[in-house]
Amino acid sequence: MGLRRCTHFATLVMPLWALALFFLVVMQVPAQTTSLQISKEDRRLQELESKMGAESEQPNANLVGPSISRFGDRRNQKTISFGRRVPLISRPMIPIELDLLMDNDDERTKAKRFDDYGHMRFGKRGGDDQFDDYGHMRFGR
């Protein structure tokens, strides 16, 4: 009787162990390969962007070739994922709505401190009629 119970228990436990092994090993491999594909794709995109940035700094860079090849490569890639991949967009630290509500005095003070050429104005006192942009007194105007 004891041997029969042991074999009956083994027949119940073995499929459970096989199922657990299937989920741990077989189901992990596609998830790891998709994550590796995504990381390789991200790394390749970063390299392409850095190359595009280096080419844009050159005066006679041909920008049509790399962009066409990049879109061609992206079209041939097939990524299996659970949803649509959303591209990462760099966002400002302050949301747009809050930025509109905030009073930025920097622009006004910057306009007062610098002229059109980026030179700092010195000696700017009260009236604009009396002194020019460089702090020199105006005569005869």
Swiss-Prot record:
Q: Name one GO molecular function term.
A: neuropeptide hormone activity
Q: Tell me the leader sequence span.
A: 1-31
Record-annotated membrane-spanning stretches: none
Please explain the role this protein plays, according to its UniProt record.
Drosulfakinin-0 (DSK 0) plays diverse biological roles including regulating gut muscle contraction in adults but not in larvae.
Q: Which residues carry this modification: Sulfotyrosine?
A: 117, 134
Give the GO biological process terms.
adult feeding behavior; adult locomotory behavior; inter-male aggressive behavior; larval locomotory behavior; multicellular organismal response to stress; neuromuscular junction development; neuropeptide signaling pathway; positive regulation of cytosolic calcium ion concentration
Q: Which residues carry this modification: Phenylalanine amide?
A: 82, 122, 139
Q: Name the chain's protein.
A: Drosulfakinins
Provide the propeptide boundaries.
32-73, 86-111
InterPro entries of this UniProt entry? Gastrin/cholecystokinin_CS, Sulfakinin
Chain positions covered by the region annotation Disordered: 49-69
The species this protein was found in: Drosophila erecta
Looking at the UniProt record for this protein, which Gene Ontology cellular component terms does it annotate, in alphabetical order?
extracellular region
